[in-house]
């Protein structure tokens, strides 16, 4: 791990030069960052699952470097970013890995009535241990390509079409059955109010498959999903911005109809700016989604979150956030596992962080997070707390 710290020290030694290198309006903005982390329960295991000799707590460091691009030729805009990170653990060295994040988006305009976006993303990172409590180094590569176009046929009305394709690939054989591919198409009809708020009706169709799954009586290899959504964005005043989505989702599996599900989805979020130095964020949601549990065909997630940021001085920012969520695993698959009820889980997480900008192009962040999950399945309970310190410089 020492070589990462040495590289980080070399990069961060140019902090004082950062203001001279970066200029307002620069199209290209390179950056480098170094983060030191501690986690008390790395694998998110319950006490009953803890194995002697397994190193649950650990410190790890992350060295990141990348480039952000924001180019605006005329009425067009191209936003791109590329970053690479190296993660090294103190005790669980078998988890060491190198990740990446690539993004490219072109926001285009043609005349006064046509606009849209074309883009692609790719990321490689370690999978979460929250639901797969295996001490293995599984890396997930996610790719996404998308394109959409919108025609404003009236000062208040517009229609749009979009398409997207996504893939997710796991690096280990144990997680290969979770690999998936999906393709989607969508159509929208929108209305803009005189004050700038928008309402949109959306019809979306998704076809997906799990290419590495063998035929099974418990999980399917392919599905089709249809969504009917009503979307809204409101700017009610100079201090309040809100976003809403309510819809109905219907999922049909290729062969196992007992795993089909349908239901209501919804999310409401708002940003409130009581002053020029403070922002509050709030969200509440109800979302239905797929699960691979043998005795449940879907999971229903309901929750709320509250966060805020306070600019204490021109250099110092304080942030806090709390989230409460319930996940209920429901649906009759026809499979009964004796002694294993359907999962029902309550999660609570909270975080607090402080950000200091000693010079314009550099920040120093420190924070802590704590959380717990209580489940109807004893082995799915866990507790954790974590701490981090991060230094980043832009050039």
Feature locations, PLM:
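Cleavable N-terminal export/targeting peptides
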Residues: 1-25
């Amino acid at each position: 791990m020492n070589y990462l710290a040495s590289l980080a020290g070399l990069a961060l030694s140019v902090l004082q030069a950062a203001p001279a290198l970066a200029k307002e309006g620069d199209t290209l903005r390179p950056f480098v960052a170094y983060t030191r982390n501690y986690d008390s329960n790395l694998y998110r295991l319950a006490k009953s699952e803890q194995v002697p000799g397994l190193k649950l707590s650990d410190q790890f460091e992350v060295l990141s470097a990348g480039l952000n691009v924001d180019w605006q030729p005329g009425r067009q805009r191209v936003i791109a970013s590329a970053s690479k990170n190296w993660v090294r653990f103190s005790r669980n060295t078998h988890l060491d890995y190198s990740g990446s994040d690539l993004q490219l988006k072109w926001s285009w305009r043609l005349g006064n009535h046509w606009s849209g976006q074309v883009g692609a993303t790719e990321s490689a990172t370690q999978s979460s241990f929250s639901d797969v409590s295996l001490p293995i180094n599984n890396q997930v590569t996610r790719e996404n390509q998308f394109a959409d176009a919108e025609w404003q046929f009236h000062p208040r009305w517009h229609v749009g079409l979009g398409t997207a394709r996504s893939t997710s690939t796991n690096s280990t054989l144990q997680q290969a059955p979770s690999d998936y591919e999906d393709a989607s198409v969508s159509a929208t009809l929108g209305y803009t109010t005189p004050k700038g708020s928008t309402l949109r009706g959306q019809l979306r169709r998704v076809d997906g498959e799990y290419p590495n799954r063998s035929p099974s009586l418990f999980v399917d290899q392919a599905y089709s999903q249809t969504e009917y959504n009503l979307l809204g964005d409101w700017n009610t005043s100079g201090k309040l911005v809100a976003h809403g989505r309510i819809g109905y989702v219907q999922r049909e599996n290729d062969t196992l109809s007992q795993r089909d599900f349908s239901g209501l989805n919804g999310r409401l979020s708002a940003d409130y700016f009581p002053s020029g130095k403070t922002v509050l964020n709030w969200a509440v949601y109800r979302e239905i989604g797929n699960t691979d549990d043998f005795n449940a065909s879907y999971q229903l997630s309901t929750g709320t979150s509250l966060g805020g940021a306070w600019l204490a001085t021109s250099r110092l920012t304080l942030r806090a956030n709390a989230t409460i969520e319930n996940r209920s695993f429901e649906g009759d698959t026809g499979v009964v596992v004796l002694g294993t009820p359907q999962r029902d889980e309550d999660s609570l997480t909270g975080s607090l962080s402080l950000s200091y900008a000693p010079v314009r192009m550099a920040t120093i962040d420190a924070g802590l997070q704590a959380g717990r999950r209580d489940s109807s399945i004893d082995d799915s309970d866990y507790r954790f707390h974590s701490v981090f310190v991060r230094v980043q410089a832009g050039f």
